[in-house]
Amino acid sequence: MIINKTRDSPSPKTLEVIGIAAVTVNGYIARHSREKTLWSKDLPLFKKQTKNCAVIMGSNTHKTLSDGLPGRKMIIVNRTDNPADILRRIDQKRCFVIGGGKTYSKFSSYLTHLYLTIHPLVFKRGIRLFTKLEKEISISFVRLVPVVAEEGIFQFQFKVE
């Protein structure tokens, strides 16, 4: 699988920067910017994986969170923020980029991993996982985590090469 990435900007420190998302089979993360992803069935896994970690999100994603994200350091970014500066200030071993499409794109050159939970849905239109990317990169499969196996919902974990 190929995903765009800018190679000339390595991740600061040894920080793991994990893009995590619930996506449809045709690559959408939401129907529109105000949608609460009630269709996602991976919330318990998301909570477990992101607990006690920094989570990076755009302002639209932040607005869709009715109760915030207890137990996590929330970092809300805007269009003018520099990803390298934000990542340099994180004093943990890992952080998660949790959306939306512009934010995944903005941090794409810093991602070390992708955790994608594929849901058996097809949206006619909406917000793609990555809205704009600069270059292609390779990712390699690491593991498959059952979410709701009987419904065919699994989290695919990839390492960004």
Positions of PLM-derived features:
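Enzymes that bind and transform nitrogen-containing heteroaromatic metabolites
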Residues: 1-161
